[in-house]
């Protein structure tokens, strides 16, 4: 997965489950959400989402003892030159897919901004996904926030 300031990162946390089932649930939701914006979004392989034959999302899964976490990216306004520099697959792999460069295989969702208001900005797309993804807002109290900060500090040290 590639990440920069021009993409949206999503973590989907669920009860631990079969890897294929968790991926299926998450990727089906994301694909349906993008289709709901008028995009021709389809799953590709185990963990990618394509629009018009170009990859717009890559995803990975991590299993904890009691949770499954899918982490994904949505390319929104990614710097394609930087992406191409960072991800240099072997020429043979590109040739197998009939393309000359990484740039030919990926797309930013911002290129479709004229199709739907939810694609006009990162904030609008995030709001659209949050409306579809969540059951509501959870407000954390100061003890919960302190615990999260403690856990993240411990994580960052290791």
Stretches found by the model and what they are:
Residues 1:
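Active-site cofactor/substrate anionic-group-binding motifs, chiefly glycine-
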Residues 4, 17-28, 43-44, 65-68, ...:
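Short, amphipathic alpha-helical segments
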Residues 5, 15, 26-32, 79, ...:
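Generic signature of intrinsically disordered, low-complexity segments enriched in small/polar residues
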Residues 6-56, 60, 73:
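A generic, well-ordered mixed alpha/beta core segment in the N-terminal half of proteins
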Residues 37-38, 57, 65-158:
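Long, positively charged amphipathic alpha-helical accessory segments at protein N-termini or as interdomain linkers
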């Amino acid at each position: 997965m590639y990440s920069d300031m021009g993409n949206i990162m999503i973590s989907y946390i669920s009860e631990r489950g079969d890897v294929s089932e968790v991926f299926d649930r998450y990727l089906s939701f994301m694909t349906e959400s993008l289709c709901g914006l008028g995009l021709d979004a389809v799953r590709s392989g185990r963990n990618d989402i394509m629009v018009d034959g170009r990859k717009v999302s890559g995803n990975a899964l991590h299993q904890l003892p009691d949770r499954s976490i899918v982490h994904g990216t949505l390319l929104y306004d990614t710097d394609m030159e930087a992406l191409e520099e960072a991800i240099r697959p072997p020429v043979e792999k590109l040739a197998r897919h009939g393309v000359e460069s990484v740039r030919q295989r990926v797309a930013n969702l911002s290129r479709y901004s004229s199709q739907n208001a939810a694609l006009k900005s990162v904030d609008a797309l995030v709001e659209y996904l949050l409306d579809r993804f969540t059951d509501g807002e959870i407000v954390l109290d100061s003890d919960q926030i302190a615990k999260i900060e403690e856990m993240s500090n411990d994580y960052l040290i290791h």
